[in-house]
């Protein structure tokens, strides 16, 4: 199997899993792999994958997005993407103005049409887990699985794989991202980077 682009529609991992299991096939449209018996979709993420898809539902990280978050606090941020340092500074700002949390989370959703109901649900999670970096990662995972209408997410690297059911609650999504390697939402990317 020759890989013809840097981001092929069907990667080696998908090809391997579909070849090994007779009930799996390639999904049309949303999702990477589908269970042919149940029609349940499994999103497949390889090395350095983002919590985003190839459709227009997802928005790209840029400096103006981060600026809009810091402008809520009437201060300027020195960041051009969302990383752990940026999240830590926002955590400190939120200590003095916790009422801004739902708006911060709304702006850090990686979809072009943010959902305030999702922001409020993850704001409640933040009250229990005051760790903005992982809360935003959990929120992006939760949204990604909703947008893709996927039942599972399967992550692989050169040494193994793991699979999770679609998170049903913010707490489920938080548990998943804390068990994985979550990295920054880089300029130009459409979501935070995740892997095993």
Spans of model-derived segments:
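Low-complexity, compositionally biased segments
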Residues: 17, 35-38, 160
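Conserved catalytic cores of phosphodiester-cleaving nucleases, focusing on short active-site segments
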Residues: 33-48
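Acidic-basic catalytic patches of nuclease active cores, encompassing PD-(D/E)XK
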Residues: 1-27
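Intrinsically disordered, compositionally biased, charge-dense segments
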Residues: 24, 41, 161-163, 196
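Catalytic cores of nucleic-acid endonucleases
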Residues: 26, 46-163
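C-terminal or late-domain output modules
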Residues: 164-196
């Amino acid at each position: 199997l020759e890989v013809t682009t840097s981001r092929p529609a069907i990667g080696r991992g998908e090809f391997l899993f579909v070849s090994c299991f007779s009930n799996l096939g390639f999904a049309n449209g949303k999702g990477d792999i589908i269970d042919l018996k149940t029609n349940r979709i499994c999103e497949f993420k390889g090395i350095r994958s983002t919590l985003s898809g190839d459709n227009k539902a997802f928005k790209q990280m840029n400096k103006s997005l981060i600026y809009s978050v810091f402008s809520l606090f009437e201060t300027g941020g020195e960041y051009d993407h969302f990383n752990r340092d940026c999240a830590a500074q926002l955590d400190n700002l939120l200590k003095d103005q916790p009422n801004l949390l739902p708006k911060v989370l709304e702006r850090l959703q990686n979809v072009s049409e943010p959902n305030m109901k999702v922001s409020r649900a993850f704001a409640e999670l933040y009250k229990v887990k005051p760790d903005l970096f992982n809360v935003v990662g959990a929120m992006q995972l939760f949204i990604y699985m909703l947008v893709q209408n996927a039942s599972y997410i399967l992550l692989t690297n050169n040494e193994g794989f793991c699979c999770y059911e679609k998170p049903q609650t913010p707490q489920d999504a938080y548990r998943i991202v804390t068990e994985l390697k979550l990295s920054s939402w880089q300029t130009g990317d459409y979501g935070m980077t995740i892997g095993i």
